[in-house]
């Protein structure tokens, strides 16, 4: 049975490493661990044609972010200026922190 765990969390800054949006940076808006997908701000924009459901909700063409596989993104390190691998350190008080493997800064 596969483990439902992602290497990125909501609010993380990530960079896309493959696909049509390769190289784009953005914040993770939503994570779906069971599907292994994330929604990244400004990445994988799709066009939806919505029908008006009521006078308060008009229809029209809407542009919104669609989920992408989490394997297509890497955590972004501000210090290195690129996508990086990360490690996990356990502090004396038991708190876990993620750190950049290139520059050893906390992410």
Swiss-Prot record:
InterPro entries: KOW, Rib_uL2_dom2, Ribosomal_uL24, Ribosomal_uL24_CS, Ribosomal_uL24_KOW, Translation_prot_SH3-like_sf. The keyword rRNA-binding applies. One of its GO terms (cellular component) is ribosome. PROSITE patterns: RIBOSOMAL_L24. One of its GO terms (biological process) is translation. SUPFAM superfamilies: Translation proteins SH3-like domain. It comes from the Bacteria. Keywords: Ribonucleoprotein, Ribosomal protein, RNA-binding, rRNA-binding. GO terms for molecular function: rRNA binding; structural constituent of ribosome. Pfam families: KOW, ribosomal_L24. Disulfide bonds: none annotated. One of two assembly initiator proteins, it binds directly to the 5'-end of the 23S rRNA, where it nucleates assembly of the 50S subunit. Part of the 50S ribosomal subunit. Belongs to the universal ribosomal protein uL24 family. This is Large ribosomal subunit protein uL24. It comes from Thermoanaerobacter pseudethanolicus (strain ATCC 33223 / 39E).
């Amino acid at each position: 049975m596969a483990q439902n765990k992602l290497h990125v969390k909501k609010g993380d800054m990530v960079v896309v490493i493959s696909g049509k949006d390769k190289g784009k940076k953005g914040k993770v808006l939503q994570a779906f661990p069971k599907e292994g997908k994330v929604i990244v701000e400004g990445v994988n924009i799709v066009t939806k044609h919505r029908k008006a459901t009521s006078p308060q909700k008009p229809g029209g063409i809407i542009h919104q972010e669609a989920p992408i596989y989490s394997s297509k993104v890497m955590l972004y390190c501000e210090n290195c200026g690129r996508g990086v691998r990360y490690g996990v350190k356990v502090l004396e008080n038991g708190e876990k922190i993620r750190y950049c493997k290139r520059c050893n800064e906390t992410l």
